[in-house]
Each structure stands twice: as C-alpha cells, then as structure tokens.
C-alpha cells in the first residue's frame, strides 16, 4: 500500500516504538521533577521559596529581620523569591523536556519562550 502514501509496516512499527520510549521516559522525568527542590530567593536572600520541578510549592523561609521591616517589604521579597523559583523551575522543566524529546519541536503549551 506504499502507493497510497501510507508508511510501510516497518516505519509504522518504528514510530510506535519511539512513542512508547518517549512515554516511558516521560514517566521517569515526571518522577524526577517531583523529587527536585528548586530554590528561588529574593535579591537580598532574606526570603526563599522552594518548588518541585513540577512547580508545586514545597516550603518557604523568611528571615525575622525581613518580617520586622513590615508587610510591604515582606510581600515584595516573597514575591521576588516566588518569581525566581518559578523562573528556575520553568527553565529546568524546559531543559528536561528538550532532553526527553531529543530536541523535537513539539511546541508544548507553557514551554515556549
């Protein structure tokens, strides 16, 4: 049936094999990302937030000296730490996905720059 523009059986089998391998690797990657702890800190280092590689919040640390400066300073530092952690985890996730897919351009939602 190659005359109808269909791939031959060998090509189809190889495509399925590759898809299964990617699926297995994706499951492993999911577990690795879940186990990661990625830290983001405020510029002065007095607020830190840790996210998993899948961007799940894990913990927060705020130095007492920051809290003593009041609500506005604390909120600003916490937001900066969260943004830093999110940026690091997004970069890590993107790099891991690119490694998993072997550089295939899959245009995954939320993973483009």
From Swiss-Prot:
Gene3D superfamilies: Nucleoid-associated protein YbaB-like domain
UniProt keyword list: Cytoplasm, DNA-binding
Gene Ontology MF terms: DNA binding
Keyword Transmembrane set for record: no
Main location (coarse class): cytoplasm
Subcellular compartments: Cytoplasm, Nucleoid
Record's GO cellular component terms: bacterial nucleoid; cytosol
Pfam families xref list: YbaB_DNA_bd
Oligomeric form and interacting partners: Homodimer.
Family to which this protein belongs: Belongs to the YbaB/EbfC family.
Role played: Binds to DNA and alters its conformation. May be involved in regulation of gene expression, nucleoid organization and DNA protection.
Identification of the protein by name: Nucleoid-associated protein PMT_0025
């Amino acid at each position: 049936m190659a005359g109808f523009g269909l791939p031959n059986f060998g090509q189809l089998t190889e495509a399925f094999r590759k898809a299964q391998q990617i699926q297995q690797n994706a499951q492993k990657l999911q577990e690795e990302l879940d186990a990661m702890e990625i830290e983001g800190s405020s510029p002065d280092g007095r607020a830190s937030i840790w996210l998993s590689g899948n961007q799940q919040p894990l913990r927060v640390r705020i130095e007492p000296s920051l809290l003593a400066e009041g609500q506005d300073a604390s909120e600003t530092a916490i937001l900066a730490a969260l943004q830093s952690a999110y940026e690091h985890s997004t970069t890590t996730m993107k790099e891991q996905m690119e490694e998993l897919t072997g550089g295939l351009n899959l245009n995954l939602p939320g993973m483009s720059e």
